[in-house]
């Protein structure tokens, strides 16, 4: 008996909508400069781009649907895999949304530690951006220097939480661990060297003719275009809008620290590069202030790291091991999950790449009824449709680099 395979591939002629003398070039999805699984369909007339169509979805994992089938604490490690270059920012955004939903107030010492983790994460993300963008354009020395400094920060994070990339270092209600004395010492050592390191990067890049050729007056985004596409973070600030959620809608203790919001009205690749460099300097200022705030917490004997809310948060480990009620409550929270009240909340935070938002709809059950992620990289990928036309193929790499997109949060 002959067995016929009913799954034989079916082929058809694919026609592209293109003008005469136009060529369609596929950039990616395996291109080393695509910053992940990005495919661009570029319509070319000779080497000039006339149309660009981003094609996404190659890394889709269904995170929003996964959240609907996980208890709230169970979803926390999944957020690490969104923008995996800045995982603590994702952890924090989700934790803050749940805390707002249930009306939880986090202890001050935990807030200070969270701010430290967030700003260290911002520096790690910006250094990674600088390294990879410089490498894409050919400045390998800066790539090596920036990765050297990022490695130092990864060692600090590893000493705190045991992980170097996907940290899961923030909990709903606070933080699981206090920082060690070596953490502060190592961080101060890094921060003392950072201004000179940033100056070294600028000295190497600002005199590099190829870097300037690919940066100045390339990939210009007007203020109106940035706003209409929903840009945020450095992409928006480089186009003339001085909007930073840490300033405009402060969370944690950002209203108690002094820092500047750098911005530019030029809107080109070079302006975005300058914003990233200035933001690293501002993050260092914030970290110095958080170190002082932490030392004041120690002096004032503010020791609590987790909020006290037995209905939603497990008791301290010592209580769980010695008190019957705390043990039972912990068992229920771990096996069945917390049950936030019926309601909905949207919380936006300033991730290294822009506005990271979490929308949660609760129907009073242990699982979110609906969870929606607002990832900045998604919108910064879409704007390539308007930026790329009028540029040449070599400019594509530098423009993609300065958008700083990560496809873990684009596809989700």
Curated annotation (Swiss-Prot):
Q: Which InterPro entries match?
A: NADH_Q_OxRdtase_suD, NDH1_su_D/H, NiFe-Hase_large
Q: Is Translocase there in the keyword field?
A: yes
Query: Main EC class of this protein?
Result: translocase
Q: Which Pfam families match?
A: Complex1_49kDa
Q: Which SUPFAM superfamilies match?
A: HydB/Nqo4-like (SSF56762)
Q: Which reaction does it catalyse?
A: a quinone + NADH + 5 H(+)(in) = a quinol + NAD(+) + 4 H(+)(out)
Topology term for the membrane: Peripheral membrane protein
- The EC number(s) this enzyme carries: 7.1.1.-
How does it associate, per the subunit comment? NDH-1 is composed of 14 different subunits. Subunits NuoB, C, D, E, F, and G constitute the peripheral sector of the complex.
Q: What is the stated purpose of this protein?
A: NDH-1 shuttles electrons from NADH, via FMN and iron-sulfur (Fe-S) centers, to quinones in the respiratory chain. The immediate electron acceptor for the enzyme in this species is believed to be ubiquinone. Couples the redox reaction to proton translocation (for every two electrons transferred, four hydrogen ions are translocated across the cytoplasmic membrane), and thus conserves the redox energy in a proton gradient.
- So what family is this one in? Belongs to the complex I 49 kDa subunit family.
According to UniProt, the name of this protein is NADH-quinone oxidoreductase subunit D
Q: Which species expresses this protein natively?
A: Sulfurimonas denitrificans (strain ATCC 33889 / DSM 1251) (Thiomicrospira denitrificans (strain ATCC 33889 / DSM 1251))
